[in-house]
Amino acid sequence: MDIRPSEISKILKEQIKNFDQKAEVSEIGWVLSVGDGIARVYGLDNVQAGEMVAFPNGVRGMALNLEVDNVGVVIFGSDRDIREGDCVKRLGAIVDVPVGPALLGRVVDALGNPIDGKGPLKETERRRVDVKAPGIIPRQSVHEPMSTGLKAIDALIPIGRGQRELVIGDRQTGKTAILLDTFLNQKPFHEKGAGREQDKVYCIYVAIGQKRSTVAQFVKVLEERGALEYSIIVAATASDPAPLQFIAPLAGCAMGEYFRDNGQHALIGYDDLSKQAVAYRQMSLLLRRPPGREAYPGDVFYLHSRLLERAAKLNAENGSGSLTALPVIETQANDVSAYIPTNVISITDGQIFLETNLFYQGIRPAVNVGLSVSRVGSAAQIKAMKQVAGSIKGELAQYREMAAFAQFGSDLDASTQRLLNRGARLTELLKQPQFSPLKTEEQVVVIFAGVNGYLDSLAVSDVARFEQGLLVLLRSDYQDLLQAIAEQKQITDELKDKLITVLNTYAKNFS
């Protein structure tokens, strides 16, 4: 066999020329100890706070405590397969989630992975979950109504686009039902050819620490009523680890910010933030952070304020988009003065206070009109609603005051008796069954009838029947009247005369 040295050197030179060295450099550390969803890791010297790390079994974690000799990592998953001495790799990215229209109609976990069995998500972009809220300059004051379809709220405690309105009450008082009805009320604007893009509101529901059956029921109702197509469900259920329950609201908020920053409107319900605070407390105590009041860490206020400040109404230069937040807080025995409730009340622009007593008396939604408030007020109402709802607040306040005194004496003068009668009927008028939100113009006509004395001669038990009959009549014969109120957004003298004529005829024939 003849080997030519010149050929060998030529081949070697070619191979050296084509040699491509690929070196993948990644910083790694080792698990010192693991337990209760927390891993102590040695060796990740350059890791950032909030950075994702990967464990050998594919489970992700987030670096939270950066200490001198180790890093405290919270684990987004089960810690059963993680052992002491396991290798942990930095991923170089802060926690992010998929966002965009591809998520509409889907149920995802706290990290944005689909859990509804409908296959992978289509094209999406990714956003960090924990970003800074918009500053003062890009914002605009809240001035557009966010209609919930509930008379008691739209008339007395109006919510505007970009507002943060707290829904607070004991367990089983209908907090989630208010969120659900508000979602369902956005449906008419999403029907084909119905609304303009600026009328559409995309809905995000974040379930934190709830039973899976409850979340499944919520999704089922949305699906049956055609509201899932414009909604995103983010679920971190009771069986999920605390870090996922902690991050779920931040992930849902990032998904809502996509719509806000693209000039669209989104509504997000956090159900509920008490459980997020509990999850955060658990993580903080296990990370050995010093406890404060009720054993919550010192920055639990900051946790909620930085989340809720991300809800905003942006000005025209920034696209005029909005993100409205409806955080839910569960109280214990109506104690609104506990730590977390007072924190969230001070952060939000008002609260809807639901009471067990009212709920069991059959007043549903069980809104305590005296304690509930919207700090945006009538700026978030159309003029027509202001015209009719202005007097109902005063009348109900007087009614509550008088009702307390009326228990002690029976000999009441005629004006007091009239006030009590009117108040009882207005309270009855504000009741509303679940899953039956009303359009704003329908609410205006119904409340107009209430404040102008059309209910005064009826028995309290007939008020609901009177209202139903009136709505049927308006929808069938007076669609033009409703249309005129919706378009003009105010009750002109001409419309008022028409309304009075319709109501006089209806009241005369009602029996």
UniProtKB/Swiss-Prot annotation:
<dbReference type="GO" id="GO:0005886">
    <property type="term" value="C:plasma membrane"/>
</dbReference>
<keyword id="KW-0139">CF(1)</keyword>
<protein>
    <recommendedName>
        <fullName>ATP synthase subunit alpha</fullName>
        <ecNumber>7.1.2.2</ecNumber>
    </recommendedName>
</protein>
<keyword id="KW-0997">Cell inner membrane</keyword>
<dbReference type="Pfam" id="PF00006">
    <property type="entry name" value="ATP-synt_ab"/>
</dbReference>
<dbReference type="Pfam" id="PF00306">
    <property type="entry name" value="ATP-synt_ab_C"/>
</dbReference>
<dbReference type="InterPro" id="IPR004100">
    <property type="entry name" value="ATPase_F1/V1/A1_a/bsu_N"/>
</dbReference>
<keyword id="KW-0813">Transport</keyword>
<dbReference type="Pfam" id="PF02874">
    <property type="entry name" value="ATP-synt_ab_N"/>
</dbReference>
<dbReference type="InterPro" id="IPR023366">
    <property type="entry name" value="ATP_synth_asu-like_sf"/>
</dbReference>
<keyword id="KW-0067">ATP-binding</keyword>
<comment type="function">
    <text>Produces ATP from ADP in the presence of a proton gradient across the membrane. The alpha chain is a regulatory subunit.</text>
</comment>
<comment type="similarity">
    <text>Belongs to the ATPase alpha/beta chains family.</text>
</comment>
<dbReference type="InterPro" id="IPR033732">
    <property type="entry name" value="ATP_synth_F1_a_nt-bd_dom"/>
</dbReference>
<comment type="subunit">
    <text>F-type ATPases have 2 components, CF(1) - the catalytic core - and CF(0) - the membrane proton channel. CF(1) has five subunits: alpha(3), beta(3), gamma(1), delta(1), epsilon(1). CF(0) has three main subunits: a(1), b(2) and c(9-12). The alpha and beta chains form an alternating ring which encloses part of the gamma chain. CF(1) is attached to CF(0) by a central stalk formed by the gamma and epsilon chains, while a peripheral stalk is formed by the delta and b chains.</text>
</comment>
<dbReference type="InterPro" id="IPR005294">
    <property type="entry name" value="ATP_synth_F1_asu"/>
</dbReference>
<keyword id="KW-1003">Cell membrane</keyword>
<dbReference type="InterPro" id="IPR000194">
    <property type="entry name" value="ATPase_F1/V1/A1_a/bsu_nucl-bd"/>
</dbReference>
<dbReference type="GO" id="GO:0046933">
    <property type="term" value="F:proton-transporting ATP synthase activity, rotational mechanism"/>
</dbReference>
<keyword id="KW-0547">Nucleotide-binding</keyword>
<dbReference type="GO" id="GO:0005524">
    <property type="term" value="F:ATP binding"/>
</dbReference>
<dbReference type="InterPro" id="IPR000793">
    <property type="entry name" value="ATP_synth_asu_C"/>
</dbReference>
<dbReference type="InterPro" id="IPR020003">
    <property type="entry name" value="ATPase_a/bsu_AS"/>
</dbReference>
<feature type="site" description="Required for activity">
    <location>
        <position position="372"/>
    </location>
</feature>
<dbReference type="GO" id="GO:0045259">
    <property type="term" value="C:proton-transporting ATP synthase complex"/>
</dbReference>
<keyword id="KW-0472">Membrane</keyword>
<keyword id="KW-0406">Ion transport</keyword>
<keyword id="KW-0066">ATP synthesis</keyword>
<feature type="binding site">
    <location>
        <begin position="169"/>
        <end position="176"/>
    </location>
    <ligand>
        <name>ATP</name>
    </ligand>
</feature>
<dbReference type="InterPro" id="IPR038376">
    <property type="entry name" value="ATP_synth_asu_C_sf"/>
</dbReference>
<dbReference type="GO" id="GO:0043531">
    <property type="term" value="F:ADP binding"/>
</dbReference>
<keyword id="KW-0375">Hydrogen ion transport</keyword>
<dbReference type="InterPro" id="IPR027417">
    <property type="entry name" value="P-loop_NTPase"/>
</dbReference>
<dbReference type="InterPro" id="IPR036121">
    <property type="entry name" value="ATPase_F1/V1/A1_a/bsu_N_sf"/>
</dbReference>
<keyword id="KW-1278">Translocase</keyword>
